[in-house]
Regions:
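Feature responds to low-complexity, polar/acidic, surface-exposed segments characteristic
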Residues: 42-65, 80-150, 156-185, 195-209, ...
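Secondary-structure capping and domain/repeat boundary segments
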Residues: 1-62, 68-71, 184
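PEST-like intrinsically disordered low-complexity regions enriched in serine, proline, threonine
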Residues: 72-73, 130, 189
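Aromatic- and glycine-enriched pocket-lining scaffold segments that form the walls
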Residues: 218
Length: 234
């Protein structure tokens, strides 16, 4: 059954990986003897779908692995097409696009409205918001630069508050094979189930480029806690 709690939204059941992680949770025993934790959003914030996807993009076939993710980010108002009928799933993302996505994600979460005023250059209003909200510490030197997976994840990790990125996975420091312990943003996203890596060891490939299709998958997990991935690297 779906539990209820006063002034909180149910985010889903998760295993507690043998740890005490119930600050925002309610523990119970399942019929199989496992401890489950009900996670709650007690902030009153969430991201909801405000549009309908009707196969808008001709380069997103229904058989593609990213189809559902592209449809979802369009419905959330997080991503649009590169053209009216194209999504360009294999294109890399730039710094300006990444800042825009992070700003839009945070504003949608906090206010329910992801719109920004027009500006020149086009990304300026998003950049100003990202700086004011602590998503970025300083303005990037090159807003047109194409980002690596590490660069993208480090920015997205700051887009939502801690209360929206609860730890559901056991990912000890140093357990991601190709990520430094100091890359706390990436570890934060692994622990929250936003990222999981390419294999059972959690390999991240931080220096590889990141595509719009991959970005869509990450944004869906940021927006919808029930879509996050459970795993254990301990």
């Amino acid at each position: 059954p779906t539990p209820t709690r006063s002034n909180a939204a149910f985010l889903g059941w998760h295993t507690n990986q043998g740890r005490e992680m119930v600050t925002n949770g309610t523990a119970m025993k399942s019929s199989y003897g496992h401890t489950l934790v009900a996670y709650w959003d007690t902030t009153g914030h969430s991201i909801t779908k405000t549009d309908s996807y009707r196969n808008n993009f001709r380069d997103v076939p229904s058989s593609a692995w990213y189809y559902d993710n592209v449809a979802a980010v369009y419905e959330y108002g997080l991503m649009n097409g590169t053209e009216s009928d194209e999504f360009s799933p294999n294109d890399q993302v730039s710094m300006a696009q990444t800042v825009t996505l992070a700003a839009r994600l945070r504003k949608l979460y906090l206010t329910g409205d992801g719109t920004f005023a027009s500006s020149s250059p086009w990304y300026q209003s998003y950049l100003d918001y990202a700086l004011s909200q602590g998503i970025l510490d300083a303005a990037p030197a090159d807003m047109n630069a194409k980002l690596t997976r590490q660069e993208f994840a480090s920015i997205l990790a700051n887009a939502l508050p801690d209360s929206a990125l609860l730890e559901i996975n056991n990912v000890p420091d140093g357990s991601i094979p190709d990520v430094y312990r100091s890359d706390t943003g990436i570890y934060r996203l692994y622990r929250a189930g936003i990222l999981s890596g390419y294999d059972d060891q959690g390999t991240f490939r931080p220096n590889s480029p990141i595509t719009r299709a991959e970005v869509a998958a990450i944004l869906v997990r940021m927006a919808d806690p029930n879509s996050r991935i459970l795993f254990d690297l301990g």
